[in-house]
From Swiss-Prot:
Belongs to the sugar phosphate cyclases superfamily. Dehydroquinate synthase family. It comes from the Archaea. This is 3-dehydroquinate synthase. It comes from Pyrococcus furiosus (strain ATCC 43587 / DSM 3638 / JCM 8422 / Vc1). The lineage of its organism: Archaea, Methanobacteriati, Methanobacteriota, Thermococci, Thermococcales. GO terms for cellular component: cytoplasm. It catalyses: 7-phospho-2-dehydro-3-deoxy-D-arabino-heptonate = 3-dehydroquinate + phosphate. Catalyzes the conversion of 3-deoxy-D-arabino-heptulosonate 7-phosphate (DAHP) to dehydroquinate (DHQ). Its cofactor is NAD(+); Co(2+); Zn(2+).
């Protein structure tokens, strides 16, 4: 797991010393500013860090926010040999990665993910993105110099954020038997905070796949399990439905497609999601959801591409007939 560090904030000075950055800027949001920024800055004081604070929320993951950050970096004299640290959840890590990859054609990037979702998914693997008429329509692939995964952040997370990230862990469980068996031993969502073994297993699954296919030309697409439907649900809700909750619903639909095509037991997915209190019913009209799925960067030649589970530990990436998708959406709406 090169570049992925499991530790506490006291490791930050050594991480930065190895880079010798010209300037250090911490990008965070209004919520994290009150909760964690002061402590992080204390550990970075020898590097004289500056900060950029943006509003909290998925709807701010757009070009306006990126433009604001670019302008602030220019004002600060930020250079290619300077370090941008993204301190926050998936929105912040996505924005920080995109800004770092585009500003002066690439600067140093470090990520300190503060949510379960970011620690197991958004901050891992080098994907960056902003929303533009759809989820992550504009983005790059750009690897950070480091990702610091600190369990202390999870201890202060509200339950809604634990659940938001747990959906991605369940996704890894469908793709990997070892993660699936570990999840089955959990009795409540908050157990994940103390189960660093499950977090490490989830990260390892993603890294193993990403190392084979960084730029998502082939195998990496399996990590989009639940996301073709999930992104459509987020879009229809105007991002009022959190990413993990949308992915949870997407996992159910795509599991049902697997059931139709391959006899996959979708009940296993529904059972785990229900045990943790994650949503399994689609709240929107199936046809509306289907149309939203067509505005998707994973589409091939205008065709909807789905990650279809065949069995626990195995999934196919394939075009799926719209009639089958509608059938699965209907079943999930009435589940």
């Amino acid at each position: 797991m090169e570049g992925i560090i499991f530790g506490d904030l006291s490791t930050l000075p050594d991480l930065l010393s190895s880079l010798s950055p010209y300037k250090v800027v911490v990008l965070t949001n209004t919520t994290l500013k009150e909760l964690w920024l002061e402590e992080v800055l204390t550990w970075l004081k020898e590097f004289k860090p500056q900060t950029i604070v943006v509003p909290d929320g998925e709807k701010y993951k757009d070009l306006d926010t990126v433009r604001y950050i670019w302008e602030k970096l220019l004002e600060m004299g930020f250079t290619r040999r300077s370090l941008l640290i993204g301190l926050g959840g998936g929105v912040i890590t996505d924005i920080a990665g995109f800004v770092a990859s585009t500003y002066m054609r690439g600067t140093y990037l470090g990520l300190v993910p503060t949510t379960l979702l970011a620690q197991v998914d958004a901050a891992i693997g080098g994907k960056t993105g902003i929303n533009f008429y759809g989820k992550n329509i504009i983005g790059t692939f750009y690897l950070p110099k480091f990702v610091l995964i600190c369990r202390d952040f999870l201890k202060t997370l509200p339950m809604v954020e634990i659940l938001n990230g747990l959906a991605e862990v369940v996704k890894y469980g469908i793709l990997d038997k070892e993660v699936y068996n570990a999840i089955k031993t959990m009795n409540s969502p908050r157990e994940i905070v103390e189960r660093e073994d499950i977090i490490k297993k989830s990260v390892a699954v993603k890294l193993r796949i990403v190392e084979e296919d960084l730029k998502e030309n082939g195998k990496r697409r399996v990590l989009n399990l639940g996301h073709t439907v999930g992104h459509a649900i987020e879009k229809i809700s105007d991002y009022k439905i959190k990413h993990g909750f949308a992915v949870s619903m997407g996992l159910v639909v795509e599991a049902k497609i697997g059931e139709i095509l391959y006899g996959f037991d979708s009940g296993k997915v529904v059972e785990i999601l229900t045990k943790f209190g994650l949503p399994v019913k689609i709240p929107f009209d199936p046809y509306t959801t289907l149309q939203a799925m067509k505005i998707d960067k994973k589409a091939w030649y205008g065709k909807i591409v789905i990650v279809v589970p065949v069995e626990i530990g195995k999934a196919n990436i394939e075009e799926v007939d719209e009639k089958i998708i509608l059938q699965a959406l209907e079943e999930a709406k009435n589940a």
